[in-house]
Amino acid sequence: MPRIIGIDIPAKKKLKISLTYIYGIGPALSEEIIARLQLNPEARAAELTEEEVGRLNALLQSDYVVEGDLRRRVQSDIKRLITIHAYRGQRHRLSLPVRGQRTKTNSRTRKGKRKTVAGKKK
């Protein structure tokens, strides 16, 4: 398993798929990185040379925000929204859907387990 920026990527998978195991790199960004470094997109991750792994590490550390840095940035953005009392921040604080989804029904994942309330007596 090649180790890229501290992450073990699967050796038997093609390079395009292996790179997506790094947080912050999806299929499109993976293709872009492979093209920039002029690597063989059909090659398996295990076939990378030490020099290619070094170039990949250098590129990811210098030009892209991935893994821990990206996670910290997302968390700080959410914290900032909460402190400035933005609507999105309040939704995050209350653990409700942030992007305008309905909450009368659905949104169970975000709200948690259903709390039963006694019905009105007739």
Swiss-Prot record:
This is Small ribosomal subunit protein uS13. One of its GO terms (biological process) is translation. Located at the top of the head of the 30S subunit, it contacts several helices of the 16S rRNA. In the 70S ribosome it contacts the 23S rRNA (bridge B1a) and protein L5 of the 50S subunit (bridge B1b), connecting the 2 subunits; these bridges are implicated in subunit movement. Contacts the tRNAs in the A and P-sites. GO terms for cellular component: cytosol; small ribosomal subunit. Part of the 30S ribosomal subunit. Forms a loose heterodimer with protein S19. Forms two bridges to the 50S subunit in the 70S ribosome. The keyword Repeat does not apply. It comes from Chlamydia muridarum (strain MoPn / Nigg). Belongs to the universal ribosomal protein uS13 family. GO terms for molecular function: rRNA binding; structural constituent of ribosome; tRNA binding. Keywords: Ribonucleoprotein, Ribosomal protein, RNA-binding, rRNA-binding, tRNA-binding. Residues 101-122 have a biased composition (Basic residues). The keyword ATP-binding does not apply. Residues 94-122 are annotated as: Disordered. Coiled coil: none annotated.
